[in-house]
Design a protein with these regions (language model features):
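The feature marks proteins involved in alpha-glucan
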Residues: 1-27
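Catalytic cores of glycan-processing enzymes that make or break glycosidic bonds
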Residues: 6-8, 210, 285, 289-293
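Non-catalytic surface loops within mature trypsin-like serine protease
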Residues: 23, 37-39, 221, 255
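Substrate-binding/active-site clefts of carbohydrate-active enzymes
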Residues: 26-31, 37-50, 54-62, 68-180, ...
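Hydrophobic faces of well-ordered beta-strands that scaffold small-molecule active sites
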Residues: 31-35, 64-66, 117-119, 186, ...
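Short, well-ordered beta-to-alpha junction loops that form the rim of enzyme active sites
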Residues: 69, 121-122, 190-193, 219-220, ...
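Active-site-proximal helices and loops of the catalytic beta/alpha 8
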Residues: 174, 189-287
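Short, surface-exposed connector motifs at secondary-structure boundaries
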Residues: 180-187
Length: 293
């Protein structure tokens, strides 16, 4: 069995490349509309969301991004309903939203209106009581006492996955391929904390199921990258992420953007940074421009 060095996350024999993907520049002109199913309608269901699709399309929406649609963990849950980013089962839909058939019908309705559908992929971590934690405890990061661990202390409702385990790669990619048979792409949560080599392999394999699959990375603030690296954890920069993703977040400009809005920084500094992006990122890069996450 091929092994992954746990200390350095140096990938051996996994046939990963080191080149940037040729991104789809048409994404520059497309509008992504984010929906949290629980809060979008009074009912908080897939079926109820369907009734709003015509309005969403009329806004000029090209891509509908559904925040996590999966069952939420109970152990360590934040609040009564829990965070959708503490996922219990990657391969199921949250029964509070409806059935799998309801989800399939929703995606069909999205497509019928000329929009694409992408779903959230939360592959850095799961809930402590997840299916994977029960069936594959070897997939998880451990502390010195052998207990499931996490790198970000105040994310107390999750435990981190350990991508030095080759079998985890296979499970996760198989899951992506299952969803790629239904949806048009993925918004990948805290993508920087999952090895870029994993995302490269995932993209190649998903392409066999969904040619032209959309890949949006939630890249991270510079402060997060510094902290992860200080801890000895791998963390990809935006430039790294373009080896596998079509789009990254605009976090690299957000401190300046917020300062401009507050009148603390002249607009010219922000436009200078936009130019710097053109000089820094690979040809064909796309940034997801947004006012907040």
């Amino acid at each position: 069995e091929q092994q992954i060095d746990k200390k350095h996350i140096d990938i051996q024999g996994l046939d990963v490349g080191k080149v940037m993907v040729q991104g789809d520049k048409s994404l520059l002109h497309q509008v992504i509309y984010s929906v949290f199913v629980r809060c979008h309608t009074p009912e908080g269901t897939f079926h109820a969301l369907e009734r709003d699709l015509d309005r969403i399309r009329a806004l000029g929406t090209d891509i509908l991004w559904l925040m996590p649609i999966h069952p939420i963990g109970i152990e360590g849950r934040k609040g009564t309903l829990g965070s959708p980013y503490a996922i219990r089962d990657y391969r199921a839909v949250n029964p509070e939203y409806g059935t799998r058939e309801d989800f399939l019908h929703l995606v069909g309705a999205i497509h019928a209106r000329g929009m694409k559908c992408i779903i959230d992929v939360v592959y850095n971590h799961t809930s402590p009581d997840s299916v994977l934690a029960h069936d594959h405890p070897e997939f998880f990061l451990r502390d010195e006492q052998g207990r499931p661990a996490r790198k970000v202390a105040d994310w107390w409702d999750i435990v981190d996955l350990d991508y030095s385990v080759p079998a985890l790669w296979t499970y996760q990619i198989d899951t992506l391929k299952q969803w790629a048979a239904i949806v048009d792409g993925f918004r990948c949560d805290v993508a920087s904390s999952v090895p870029i080599e994993f995302w490269e392999r995932a993209r190649r394999e998903v392409e066999t199921v969904r040619p032209g699959c959309i890949w949006l990375a939630e890249s991270v603030h510079g402060a997060y990258i510094r902290e992860m690296r200080r801890m000895g954890a791998a963390c990809s920069t935006d430039t790294d992420l373009y080896r596998a993703f079509d789009m990254t977040y605009d976090y690299d400009l957000w401190p300046c953007y917020e300062a401009v809005l507050k009148g603390k920084t002249p607009l010219c500094q922000f436009t200078d940074l936009l130019t710097y992006q053109e000089l820094t990122y690979p040809t064909g890069y796309v940034k997801a421009r947004c006012v907040e996450n």
